[in-house]
Amino acid sequence: MIHVAIIAGGKGERFWPFSTRENPKQLLKIASDKTMLEETLDRVADFVPLEQTVIVTGENIRKQILERHPSLKESNILAEPFGKNTCLAVGFAAIHLHKKDPNGVMIVLSADHYIKPKERLIDILRFGAAIAERDDVLITLGINPTRPETGYGYIELGEQYDSFDGLISFRVKQFKEKPNRTLAQQYYIGRMHMWNSGMFIWSAKSILNAISRCKPEMYKLLTDYAETIGTPGEANARLELFEKAEGVSIDVGVLEEANNVVVIKADLIWDDIGSWLALERISPKDKDNNVSIGDTILHESFEISTVNSGDGILATLGVSDLVIVKTNSVVLVAHKTRVNDIKSLLARMKDDPRYDQYL
């Protein structure tokens, strides 16, 4: 059987002040009139039924997720007591799935991606699921670069692995960390590197075996926890799991070490919606190359992105190359070249208790 695990943790700090600790970006309407999580659920609804879908998220937003998405039930939520990066999030979902369906295939999606068209995504997932059911491999979806991007990790293609109906998979030769501008340009021109999308397909058995090889301590914690699932001791065991397990990404912790990784060339329109700069790539622009969301008036302003989610209007005059975000309690004004440094601003705010209510 095919299952979906949607990773919906994280604080979305680079979307502050729209995204906050108690209202992170996966619960916000950024790319459409639906929340990011709702968009993700809709993408796979015609392929995998909701009862075979779980959302891995923080306990602190479990209630909000259920309230804003009435179709979801408690059984759809796997709540982490606190975030510990994606290796544990994936392992947490995999151990639950394996207990329920030992031969199950697991599709891992992120709740903060922009993906079009939905139909092509389902074709790709179906192709990958067929491979994962047949072979002991770990599959990642690679995106053809559309620009020399320094903010993404890359995957170097090896020999062809499989193909079907125009879709092709390759052995992964090597994972590459986020490159500098020169390397990114080489990857873009060379066409042998793909963006690492953070979407994966594997059997629960295959990923747990990989964790056991690459992160044996984490695997032992996961299997100890699995013994308590459905018992009165589960909550305490889950807390112990998250307290003791290493905080590492699935890419660094497992995929970069594994020798059975395959990448599918995913011919999709894709963006990871990682920061306010993503709005320029997914939103319509006016004649002055501005992006405007909410009640705004932009006069003699160029190359700016504005978001007004609060009361009143947001007006600009004679400015350029800015990101301006207004809520009912905060206004952020940042130059586009610095908008990815929002975390440094938040770090300063965290040092002063006066600002805690705005985080």
Residue ranges and their predicted role:
Residues 1-2, 50-51, 73-74, 101-104, ...:
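Short coil/turn connectors at secondary-structure junctions
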Residues 1-6, 14-17, 21, 29-110, ...:
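Conserved N-terminal catalytic core of the sugar/cofactor nucleotidyltransferase
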Residues 7-8, 56, 107-110, 140-144, ...:
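Short beta-strand segments
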Residues 37, 93, 112, 155, ...:
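Residue-level signal for inorganic ion chemistry
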Residues 113-115, 145, 270:
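Short histidine/acidic/glycine/proline-rich micro-motifs that form metal-
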Residues 118-232, 236-241, 262, 335-336:
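Conserved core of the sugar-phosphate nucleotidyltransferase
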Residues 204-359:
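Left-handed beta-helix
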